[in-house]
């Protein structure tokens, strides 16, 4: 009421002052106007026209001035009463980094493929239990935030990303979780959109205390993950594997697109997997380059071959044997060790001899499969032993190898029981004991390559 009376008193004073000003101003205005329009406009007529207009303008200005002063006064009083900002005493952190790559619609997990966990800690990162639940909001953040190690709550809020127009919420799933006993678990959460449309082209996942959940006197700093790229789910169908697997389709290699020119050329020559690609690169690299054609530049070739070479070969080994030789090959046709005419070859120089390469090429071109074995614990060391030991081995063991004269050179055997550690029946060459190979049989599939 006091404010209203103040407004009325001010309004009355302003009106009186305005009226006096108008009366003093109007005669001076009337004189020149009257001289122009002559007898058409009298002083009284001019006053009756202008006076309401001027009154209205004065009233509006007075109202604006009073309301502005009232707002400033009330804002100042609020600032005085507001408590001072407190420094966070606790903070939230994500226990582990995220598993990448991340695709839209795919469940987000940590590096160990477990649900994301958020823990409450103090300044020294020691777990804290407040003995009461705290609700958290899970949000998406700009990947380039923050610029330093610290941030304010206002900065955190201003970097929360909302969905694009016409899109679903950017994060779907458990976007609200509860900290109990100092830990919160996000059971399932996914991104619904890729990160290519924002300035940093990356997202972070953030966690903040929901409004009204922390309680008086407790300030909790927000948590956020590392910056990650989120790709469209449809890209997962065409993504490259790092590292590739032997059985992966060949287009999983860099620079070879699915259903592209290189993929079609390779498929036409029965090179369908990463293993097929690697085997031919070992046996006849020139033929492989010829299949790919001039479109595969030297630079592209280096990238593709380097990617293929990242492949994990595993423990499987393959045995090729004939009347005067015994060879151990890895899954991509590289000779690990060979026994030829009583001499054990293990050095790289000896394994690169033309005769050995011809044996490898012959094994590769056969339509049957080689015997399959696995490395034993000592096999890796044996494959790298020196020539002196090789000579001793050849002298003491070669005479014990039985040879079936009717057995074809580089002959193959069909599937055998996994219990047979040494093939001795039917007069075949027995496996040299110190090669430490455990036989698991051979495949029964039929395709052009023997492995």
Curated annotation (Swiss-Prot):
It is found in: Nucleus. GO terms for biological process: cellular response to molecule of bacterial origin; defense response to bacterium; defense response to oomycetes; plant-type hypersensitive response; positive regulation of defense response to bacterium; regulation of DNA-templated transcription; regulation of salicylic acid biosynthetic process; regulation of systemic acquired resistance. InterPro entries: Calmod_bind_C, Calmod_bind_M, Calmodulin_bind_N, CBP60. The keyword DNA-binding applies. Pfam families: Calmod_bind_C (PF20452), Calmod_bind_M (PF20451), Calmodulin_bind (PF07887). Disruption phenotype: Compromised basal resistance and systemic acquired resistance (SAR) induced by Pseudomonas syringae p.v. maculicola ES4326 toward Hyaloperonospora arabidopsidis Noco2. Plants lacking both SARD1 and CBP60G fail to accumulate salicylic acid (SA) and to express PR1 and SID2 upon both biotic and abiotic stresses. Induction: Induced slowly by Pseudomonas syringae p.v. maculicola ES4326 and by microbe-associated molecular patterns (MAMPs) such as flg22 in both local and systemic leaves. One of its GO terms (molecular function) is sequence-specific DNA binding. The keyword DNA-binding applies. Keywords: Activator, DNA-binding, Hypersensitive response, Nucleus, Plant defense, Transcription, Transcription regulation. GO terms for cellular component: nucleus. Residues 149-270 are annotated as: DNA-binding. (Microbial infection) Interacts with V.dahliae SCP41. Transcription activator that binds DNA in a sequence-specific manner, 5'-GAAATTTTGG-3', to promote the expression of target genes. Recruited to the promoter of ICS1 and other defense-related genes (e.g. PR1 and SID2) in response to both biotic (e.g. Pseudomonas syringae pv. maculicola ES4326) and abiotic stresses (e.g. UV-B), thus triggering slow defense responses by stimulating salicylic acid (SA) biosynthesis. Required for basal and systemic acquired resistance to P.syringae pv. maculicola and Hyaloperonospora arabidopsidis. Belongs to the plant ACBP60 protein family. This is Protein SAR DEFICIENT 1. It comes from Arabidopsis thaliana (Mouse-ear cress). The lineage of its organism: Eukaryota, Viridiplantae, Streptophyta, Embryophyta, Tracheophyta.
